[in-house]
């Protein structure tokens, strides 16, 4: 290739120099959130984590004290982690397994009877990599009722998992999953429908 045909490299975007913008880059969270987050981290690392294995009601109470909306008879394992309790909502009989991580920089909703298995990761935040400042982007995650997030699966920001859907172990989900579908792989793809046996007829009165 001759010198005349050599493409000109693009001019790089200059780095952020404005001090206010740089400060926002370091942390965009309100001061009140930082204080609550600090208090919660102390509670989570002590009263929450070192509670008895069967004390889900106790852990539910601690989450509620920090603003979470927790339904009835939820099972929350002591080794699970929640980043911002006040951005978490769980329906009745929902389950969060051992070492599951709810990195809820944005709101996370877990529906009735939904299961988030061990070491699953719900990540409601990312960064805009098209800008050198890498500003934070938060998007809600919704896990529908009767859905199952299997072990070590990743669910990204802005994703809705439909009612009754199943996310296979170690799957990476960056797009919505329709109700009653089973997805697996990286990136997650639909592998089949989830078919349930018909409900028994109601008893005769």
Please describe what each predicted stretch is:
Residues 1-68, 72, 146, 186-205:
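Terminal amphipathic alpha-helical/low-complexity segments used for targeting or macromolecular assembly
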Residues 48-49, 133, 151:
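A generic secondary-structure micro-motif detector
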Residues 53, 57, 65, 85, ...:
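Residues at secondary-structure transition points
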Residues 72, 77-78, 83-84, 91-92, ...:
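Left-handed beta-helix
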Residues 121-122, 128, 189, 197:
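Active-site/binding-pocket entry motifs
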Residues 126-128, 132-134, 159, 193-194:
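Conserved catalytic-core motifs of eukaryotic protein kinase domains, centered on the activation segment
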Residues 129-133, 137, 198-204:
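Short glycine/proline- and charge-enriched loop/turn segments
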């Amino acid at each position: 290739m001759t010198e005349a045909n050599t493409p000109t490299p693009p001019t790089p975007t200059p780095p952020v120099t404005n001090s206010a913008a740089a400060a926002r880059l370091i942390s965009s969270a309100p001061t009140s959130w930082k204080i609550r987050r600090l208090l919660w981290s102390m509670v989570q690392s002590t009263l929450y984590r070192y509670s008895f294995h069967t004390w889900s009601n106790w852990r539910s109470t601690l989450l509620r004290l920090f603003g979470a909306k927790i339904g009835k008879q939820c099972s929350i394992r002591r080794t699970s982690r929640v980043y911002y309790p006040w951005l978490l909502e769980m329906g009745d009989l929902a389950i969060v397994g051992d070492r599951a991580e709810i990195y809820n920089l944005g709101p996370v909703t877990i529906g009735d009877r939904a299961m988030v298995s061990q070491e699953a990761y719900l990540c409601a935040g990312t960064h805009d990599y098209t800008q050198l400042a890498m500003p934070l982007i938060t998007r809600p995650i919704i896990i529908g009722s009767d859905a199952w997030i299997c072990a070590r699966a990743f669910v990204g920001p802005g994703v809705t998992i439909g009612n009754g859907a199943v996310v296979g172990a170690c799957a990476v989900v960056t797009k919505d999953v329709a109700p009653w579908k089973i997805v697996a792989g990286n990136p997650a793809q639909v592998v089949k429908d989830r078919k349930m046996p018909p409900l028994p007829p109601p008893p005769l009165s």
